[in-house]
From Swiss-Prot:
This is NADH-quinone oxidoreductase subunit B. Binds 1 [4Fe-4S] cluster. The lineage of its organism: Bacteria, Pseudomonadati, Pseudomonadota, Alphaproteobacteria, Hyphomicrobiales. It is an enzyme of class 7 (translocase). It comes from Brucella anthropi (strain ATCC 49188 / DSM 6882 / CCUG 24695 / JCM 21032 / LMG 3331 / NBRC 15819 / NCTC 12168 / Alc 37). The gene is nuoB. It is found in: Cell inner membrane.
Length: 193
């Protein structure tokens, strides 16, 4: 019954994914983490890991970011939540409270008057906490670098983990920065000893 008359089982074709134009292979096929994971699953049928590695894996897949939009870069920051980029498919979602956030995205010109508020919000975030500096103004003052009222980079107020360049940076650049933060967390771990 149905569309075929033969009694054969229909099998879906191998998914192709996004191909890397340089290598011709699917993107991520040479990632050491996933290659190790696949080889362990095919050998044993289950995965043996440490608690540190499990917690680090869980943290990278559930980053909650807090918006600290100070200027025009905040518009591009909003774009990554829209359907075209859909940042939630990578396990990141916006939160309104610093007490529920892992990542703060500083987007825009940081003034001297706003710097204490930035530090206060950063101090309210639970450990481990991460900061992404988005745009030329947040990275180093940008166009307003020589103004008396502008902090020449938010790294003078809070420690920054990832810098996203551009004026304003595109939503793709911010998404790439978030993916690099996930890679950094995976590489360095999150548990202090």
């Amino acid at each position: 019954m149905g569309l075929t008359t033969a009694n054969t089982t229909l099998v879906a074709p191998q998914p192709k994914g996004i191909l890397d134009p340089r290598t011709g292979k699917p993107v991520g096929s040479d990632d050491a983490f996933f290659n190790d994971l696949n080889s362990e699953l095919s050998d044993k049928g289950f995965i043996v890991t440490s608690a540190d590695a499990l917690i680090t894996w869980a943290r990278t897949g559930s980053l909650m970011w807090m918006t600290f939009g100070l200027a025009c870069c905040a518009v591009e920051m909003m774009h990554i939540s829209m359907p075209r980029y859909d940042a939630e498919r990578f396990g990141i979602a916006p939160r309104a409270s610093p007490r529920q956030s892992d990542v703060m995205i500083v987007a825009g010109t940081l003034t001297n008057k706003m710097a204490p508020a930035l530090r206060k919000v950063y101090d309210q975030m639970p450990e481990p906490r991460y900061v992404i500096s988005m745009g030329s103004c947040a990275n180093g003052g940008g166009y307003y670098h020589y103004s008396y009222s502008v902090v020449r980079g938010c790294d003078r107020v809070v420690p920054v983990d990832i810098y996203v360049p551009g004026c304003p940076p595109t939503a793709e650049a911010l998404l790439y920065g978030i993916l690099m933060l996930q890679k950094k967390i995976r590489r360095t771990g999150t548990i202090e000893r």
